């Protein structure tokens, strides 16, 4: 079925990335499935994470349906685009409805993107994660693709003015090997294992990042940056 909204939006994003001279580096793209359902579980450091992560999946010719807050769908400009791209609205007062919608999409062979932290991490460390990604993967019996992104927070993140004038920002994204969970898998244990995997992947991305983190607002204190500490971030 033709994607009347998603396809032109992707093409527009690609023009924007070219104009900003984004320096993409993708790792593990071979782990992205070319068919069948899958859960993309990613850390969250920027308002543009979904667009960058989707860019890395273009070669698979798959369209990731991201789960996003209901408030984004209520926006007069973003709302129609999000609905047209078949992203999934998450109403925190009725979370079960969005879970069921995502589950149906996965069982129909769609790729669903989710940020288990639920909100942007202002410390840029991976915070406590909710169990949605694990429960969806178990319920639909599809793999989880652990994913991490680094650098996108330098353009537009929570609590810091966006800067679309910044050019040639390195944005690194890694897609990990698929994680398959049995129907009777323990959700809590699987969630802990997923977080450990994502933290390890993120640290590796940060170690290979070409720009220094020292003294930078977009970098965590662990790396010498000046972002809020995890315990006090708003």
What name fits each language-model region?
Residues 56, 81, 104, 135-139:
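Hydrophobic/aromatic ligand-binding patch that stacks against planar heteroaromatic rings
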Residues 33-94:
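Catalytic core of membrane glycerolipid acyltransferases/transacylases, capturing the structured
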Residues 1-18, 23-34, 104-107, 166, ...:
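Membrane-interfacial terminal anchoring regions of lipid-handling membrane enzymes
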Residues 105-133:
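Catalytic-site beta-strand/loop segments enriched in glycine and acidic/polar residues
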Residues 87-93, 97-109:
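Helix-adjacent hinge/juxtasegments
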Residues 124-186, 220-221, 228-229:
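A cross-family acyltransferase "interaction/gating" segment
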């Amino acid at each position: 079925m033709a994607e009347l909204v998603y396809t032109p939006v992707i093409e527009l994003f690609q023009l924007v990335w070219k104009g900003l001279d984004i320096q993409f580096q993708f790792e593990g793209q071979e782990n992205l499935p070319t068919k069948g359902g899958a859960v993309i579980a990613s850390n969250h450091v920027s308002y543009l994470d979904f667009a960058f992560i989707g860019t890395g999946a273009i070669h698979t010719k798959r369209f990731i349906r991201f789960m996003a807050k209901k408030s984004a769908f209520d926006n007069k400009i973003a709302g129609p685009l999000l609905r047209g791209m078949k992203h999934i609205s998450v109403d925190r007062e009725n979370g079960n409805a969005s879970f069921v919608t995502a589950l149906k999409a996965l069982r129909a062979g769609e790729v669903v993107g989710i940020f288990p932290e639920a909100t942007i991490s202002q410390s840029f460390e991976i915070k406590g994660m909710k169990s949605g990604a694990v429960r969806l993967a178990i319920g639909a019996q599809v793999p989880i693709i652990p994913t991490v992104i680094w650098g996108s927070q330098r353009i537009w993140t929570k609590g810091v003015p966006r800067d679309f004038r910044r050019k040639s920002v390195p944005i690194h994204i890694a897609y990990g090997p698929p994680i398959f969970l049995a129907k009777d898998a323990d959700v809590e244990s699987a969630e802990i294992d997923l977080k450990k995997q994502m933290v390890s992947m993120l640290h590796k991305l940060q170690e290979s990042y070409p720009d220094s983190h020292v003294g930078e607002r977009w970098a965590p204190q662990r790396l010498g940056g000046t972002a809020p500490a995890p315990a006090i971030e708003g």
